From Swiss-Prot:
Listed CDD domains: PTKc, SH2_Fps_family
Membrane topology: Peripheral membrane protein
GO molecular function, one term: metal ion binding
Organism placement in taxonomy: Eukaryota, Metazoa, Ecdysozoa, Nematoda, Chromadorea
Record text on subunit structure and interactions: Interacts with hmp-2.
UniProt-recorded name of the protein: Fer-related kinase 1
């Protein structure tokens, strides 16, 4: 029998036999768990927070095409045996699961839920012992960011975002939502998700490492040529156009959130505020970068794919101004007033290619969102112009 980490109220916690089981998915959220279970009888075991600070084990089962059920695993404090809802008991969790599978006995009489196929962990669910943190890069919204070495049959350098152990359940769900979104995206100008480590704390998002750092830092530290600025602009448009086609509203497009690969190729990163929706309402607008917001976001607290196009225009201004802060000399409050009340637009920096300036001022910064073009058409125009200049 594996070692039991006991928890109160007869709830079972992780045992050694479960930790190594292929159907154990760690702290995968309910929404992700249900997405993994495709056919009736598919099941997995996961950790879940029953109440603040109390993490227990649960089994998720696909009961019908439309319905998944979730069952707590319990331990009898007298016999030290495991059971579901006061039914059959076994000495280990794996033996209990095997009994229900082989006898085809429902997990509970009321649900009728039978388990048939264990859902093995996906390749992108990474074991913590495969990751060795090397150097701290900085701090993110949820925790620290590191350069690390990932060993999965071959070593590679990766970037790892961590989640503080003391983070709230809501913060953990946001963290996992970011990973879930990134998992969908495969594009040369979008940072690639390699996987997540969620069996224990700290939770980790493992991504491709971009050794040349942020675009903002590169612009500030180096003398960047006009043709390279045009390339950055075109690559950013390519990545954002892909996200638009993927129905992703990024909400935080800025030079600080663009990373550079070893070949200095631009990649869109940081999906902490993103979502797959046509419209997002944010009633608070807390901790948002005011100087990058579209007028309708400032006034109506709404984000759409068209607000990302406005923000792309601000990113282009950053690129051609060598990483200067937008609306120089203005506070956030002054910026908001000038845009909303006075319909103010920044002048594009000296040296900006006229074609690029026309895209920004004539398309991206249209007051009426419906008059802003699509990112696909913006990228097409910029790509053709860049090709003519190479």
């Amino acid at each position: 029998m594996g070692t039991v980490e006991k928890s109160s109220n007869n709830d079972a916690s992780v045992t050694d036999d479960i930790r190594s089981a292929e159907y154990y998915h760690g702290m995968v959220p309910r929404q992700d768990a249900e997405g993994f279970l495709k056919r009736e009888g598919d099941f997995l075991v996961r950790k879940t927070e029953q109440m603040p600070g109390k993490v227990v084990l649960a089994m998720s089962v696909r009961v019908t095409d439309e319905l998944c059920r979730h069952f707590m695993l319990n331990m009898d404090p007298t016999s030290n045996k495991f059971y579901f809802e006061h039914t059959h008991q076994e000495s280990t969790i794996s033996e209990l699961i095997n009994w229900h599978m082989t006898t085809k006995t429902p997990i509970s009489a009321a649900s009728g839920a039978k388990i048939r196929r264990p859902m093995e962990r996906s390749p992108w669910l990474i074991n913590h012992d495969s990751i060795v943190a090397n150097k701290k890069l900085g701090e993110g919204a949820f925790g620290d960011v590191f350069i690390a070495e990932l060993d999965q049959g071959g070593k590679q350098e990766v970037a790892v975002k961590t989640m503080r152990a003391e983070a709230t359940r809501e913060a953990r769900l946001r963290f996992m939502k970011e990973a879930r979104l990134m998992r969908k995206y495969q594009h040369k100008h979008v940072v690639k998700l390699i996987g997540v480590a969620i069996h224990e704390h700290p939770l980790m998002i493992v991504m491709e490492y971009c050794p040349n750092g942020s675009l903002l830092s590169h612009l500030k530290k180096n003398k960047v040529s006009l043709i390279e600025k045009l390339r950055f602009t075109t690559e950013a448009a390519d990545g954002i156009a892909y996200l638009e086609r993927s129905k992703c509203i990024h909400r935080d497009i800025a030079a600080r959130n663009c990373l550079l690969s070893a070949k200095n190729e631009l990649k869109i990163s940081d999906f902490g505020m993103s979502d797959n929706k046509d419209e997002i309402k944010d009633e608070t607008l807390e901790k948002v970068p005011i100087k990058w917001l579209a007028p309708e976001t400032m006034q109506e607290k709404v984000y759409t794919h068209k607000t990302d196009i406005w923000t792309f225009g601000v990113l282009v201004w950053e690129i051609y101004s060598d990483g200067a802060e937008p609306y120089p000399g203005l506070t956030k409050i002054q910026t908001r007033a000038k845009i909303v009340v006075n319909d103010y637009r920044m002048k594009m920096p000296d040296g900006t290619h006229p074609t690029v300036a026309d895209v920004v001022t004539g398309t991206c910064w249209q007051k009426n969102p419906e008059k802003r073009s699509t990112m696909d058409s913006i990228h097409k125009k910029l790509r053709e112009f860049y090709e003519s200049k190479k």
